[in-house]
């Protein structure tokens, strides 16, 4: 039995039409194959060099967990990159219309959390779903968290969600 479902920065509609989608759709659908050879060549680097490259790429993060670095090293695998890019290309093609029927059927169990500067699901999407479902638990981030919060704000997000779900957790 599902008590609650939390949709964080939900990419549930019009992905290819979002600002980031307009940029990424051609790359993901047509040019993704061009990345396979460079990734294949980088896969031969020693693990320490890969970790250094990841740290360099993530240097702008305010905090970066060692787990983010360890996980990001998987991006040097051709199989991993091929699967990621294929899945992302399919999302651009298939995630088009919001499933309002399913949302309406489960509205009392859903929490939506939208970002103010999210280029994957812009604030316009928040405004529209809030208008369509005024009784829903649909929130707009006031903390400036970004879509890729797992890279630098996972603890902050976890604490926030724990607060939201406190009543549900006492029922278990």
Summary of predicted features, one role per range:
Residues 79-131:
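Conserved serine/cysteine hydrolase catalytic core
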Residues 108, 127, 131-172:
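Catalytic active-site module of serine/aspartate enzymes centered on a nucleophile-bearing elbow/loop
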Residues 16-21, 124-125, 153:
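Short aromatic-enriched loop/helix-cap "lid" or pocket-rim segments at secondary-structure transitions
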Residues 29-36, 101-105, 163-172:
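Eukaryotic N-terminal low-complexity, Ser/Thr- and Lys/Arg-rich leader segments
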Residues 44-86, 97-98:
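Conserved alpha/beta-hydrolase catalytic His-Asp/Glu region
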């Amino acid at each position: 039995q599902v008590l609650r479902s939390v949709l964080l920065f939900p990419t549930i509609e019009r992905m290819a039409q979002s600002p980031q989608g307009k940029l990424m759709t051609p790359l993901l659908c047509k040019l993704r194959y061009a990345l396979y050879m460079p990734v294949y060549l980088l896969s031969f680097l020693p693990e320490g060099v890969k970790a250094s490259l990841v740290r360099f790429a993530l240097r702008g993060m305010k905090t970066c967990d060692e787990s983010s670095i360890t996980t990001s090293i998987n991006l040097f695998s051709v199989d991993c990159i091929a699967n990621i890019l294929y899945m992302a290309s399919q999302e651009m093609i298939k995630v088009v219309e919001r499933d309002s029927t399913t949302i309406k059927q489960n509205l009392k169990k859903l929490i939506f959390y939208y970002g103010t500067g999210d280029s994957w699901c812009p604030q316009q999407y928040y405004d529209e779903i809030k208008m369509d479902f005024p009784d829903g638990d649909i929130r707009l981030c006031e903390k400036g968290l970004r879509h890729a919060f797992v890279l630098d704000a996972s603890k902050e997000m976890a604490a926030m969600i724990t607060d939201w779900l406190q009543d549900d957790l006492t029922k278990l």
